[in-house]
């Protein structure tokens, strides 16, 4: 049995829907790691959130010391990390790069940024892929590695690290972190799948998106370029968790296994949960689980960086640090501050 995750944020609970994989090689039975992920995910928010009344410089010193003392670091990266690194989705960027879509479809509420435009009810598949191919190219394929991602990984060099990310831009791979150290639980901009999940496999669409980007006219791609499912002959879709048909393929389950292994071996070591730009859009994946782990294990320190949502459960005391400031500056300050090193960092 494989596990598909379905989230209902209104009730702040996590629901799991199981479906048979029919024993396919693309969807192995990983019930142990699935159980770990299920126990990790948490839909319960804290009841005692506070903005910590501690000077910024003190928080930076505390965060830097916690990371220096840690054996391992689990990074939880949300949309705020990409934004802090310079990624742009709306405003002048959207108008400049997607102005033709705004003119064609009008000043629709959907046509305000790259997030909302993905949910626009495009009239046909030529138009649908006309939009999504451009978003994939600009938001992932041609997006250079950001200095912030590179600086972060360089600053954690020598630590045992793993990244759990809800971002689709592939930045941590581009920054040099091995794929085995990354779990992109929500999918990415580089793969497509059967729109109705008739089989458990995804397909690298990088080359296809680049070709679509060149062939697009009047916001549409030629009909012959519309991808079809090689199994059922039906429509294809982005491999992004946006509905109940998200495909979790063998690579997804391998990433889940690596994540589970990292968490298991880290629970009896000094572990820092470094949460970067995670808000309340999908808090059941990173924010709430990080709080739950910190509550349950005295050896864990939570470091939460966010522009304006770095509230911390007061009950976590000095094992949680919430830095409410420009995240790029906070990361730079943490990595640059002088700290004591009680013992050498372990090799990754």
Where do the language-model regions lie?
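Conserved catalytic alpha/beta core of Sir2/sirtuin-type deacylases, generalized to analogous enzyme cores
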Residues: 2-348
